Curated annotation (Swiss-Prot):
The lineage of its organism: Bacteria, Pseudomonadati, Pseudomonadota, Gammaproteobacteria, Alteromonadales. The keyword Secreted does not apply. One of its GO terms (biological process) is electron transport chain. The modification FMN phosphoryl threonine is found at T185. This is Ion-translocating oxidoreductase complex subunit D. Part of a membrane-bound complex that couples electron transfer with translocation of ions across the membrane. Keywords: Cell inner membrane, Cell membrane, Electron transport, Flavoprotein, FMN, Membrane, Phosphoprotein, Translocase, Transmembrane, Transmembrane helix, Transport. One of its GO terms (cellular component) is plasma membrane.
Length: 349
């Protein structure tokens, strides 16, 4: 009996774009739930508003381009971008900020370059940087975590502040800790205190800190880490970029901490503060804007981790993942060019 051998590949993975996006969104949910638990319903409101704007903008652009609206919406890429923007901005930021940011991400960053698969920059991070540069006060005004807050916003409070309706609530009352002092994020607090001459140990006696990490933020990062590990298990992402991000940040922060423990945050503090785990597993791993080869992905991720540490400690913004990711996006083509495997019979590069 003669057997016919089919052409390669002989093993395939039936993972469509929509399936991958669905898995990423589902793995984001633990982090979203924990974030809402510590920072109130505002985060969920921002996410839902971002989804509405993203899907509307996606449909409008597809109609203008005379493409299939149903096919574009069903790939879930616009929804994922919306969720990432929603969890990245302060929970009680004005409604028009999330509208501007999400519309910019979908219309300009994604579709101006040709749509899904053609954008040069991560849409969510480009939107975040636009908002941070344009509205720095609103983008750096976080409320106190619920466990140390004097007052926690209810659903009604969140809606009133986000949509600026009613006059019986004020943002300032939700920034107060149990000691009556207005709170910033742990990264912001440490950076400000160090610039005022306090040591790391003195700064971390404040209520916003819980041991070596920040109140609430440790658990938020732990939840995103758990979701990220599930993503790896499901093979929705590869390990190279996430490992590179965490390794680069860990090594850079370890060197800084060893050289000056009184003026630098510990590696544990950097790994479990701000958007570290969210960015490492859900943002930096965007396959469109990252390097493509295994070695290139490791370099890409490591570059992000090192840039985050440099900007956090030397720059003007306490959390730096958006800038680090966009800078690495710029470097991705060069990384691919110099580390791509040599084709047989041709020189490398």
């Amino acid at each position: 009996m003669a057997f016919k051998i089919a052409s390669s590949p002989h093993v395939t993975r039936n993972l469509h774009t929509s399936t991958v996006m669905q898995r990423v969104i589902l793995c984001l949910l633990p982090g979203l739930v924990v974030q809402c638990a510590f920072f109130g319903w505002g985060t969920l409101v921002q996410v839902l508003l971002a989804i509405i704007v993203a899907l509307s903008a996606e449909a409008a652009v597809m109609k203008l381009r005379q493409r299939s609206i149903k096919a574009s919406l069903s790939d879930n890429s616009a929804m994922l971008t919306a969720i990432l923007i929603g969890v990245a901005i302060p929970p009680l930021a004005p409604w028009w900020m999330i509208v501007i940011g999400t519309a910019f991400a979908i219309i300009i960053v994604k579709h101006l370059y040709g749509g899904l698969g053609h954008n040069l920059f991560n849409p969510a991070m480009a939107a975040y940087v636009l908002l941070l540069i344009s509205f720095p006060v609103q983008m750096t005004t976080w409320i106190a975590p619920s466990t140390v807050a004097m007052h926690s916003p209810s659903v009604l409070d969140s809606l009133q502040l986000i949509f600026n309706i009613g006059a019986n609530v004020n943002m300032d009352q939700f920034r107060l800790g149990i000691d009556g002092v207005a709170m910033a994020t742990p990264l912001d607090t440490l950076k400000t205190d160090l610039s005022m001459g306090l040591t790391r140990t003195e700064s971390m006696t404040k209520a916003i800190f819980d041991g070596a990490t920040g109140v609430g933020w440790f658990w938020v990062n732990l939840a995103y880490l758990a979701g990220g590990l599930v993503l790896l298990k499901l093979k929705a992402i590869r390990w190279h970029i996430s490992t590179g991000v965490l390794a680069g940040l860990f090594i850079a922060s370890s060197v800084g901490f060893l050289l000056s423990p009184d003026t630098q945050g510990s590696p544990l503090f950097h790994l479990f503060s701000g958007a570290t785990m969210l960015a490492a597993f859900f943002i930096a791993t965007d396959p469109v804007t990252a390097a493509t080869s295994p070695r290139g992905r490791i370099i890409f991720g490591t570059l992000i981790g090192i840039l985050v540490y440099i900007i956090r400690t030397q720059g003007g913004y306490p959390d730096a993942f958006a800038f680090a990711v966009l800078l690495a996006n710029l470097c991705a083509p060069f990384i691919d060019y110099y580390v791509r495997p040599r084709s047989y019979g041709h020189s490398a590069g």
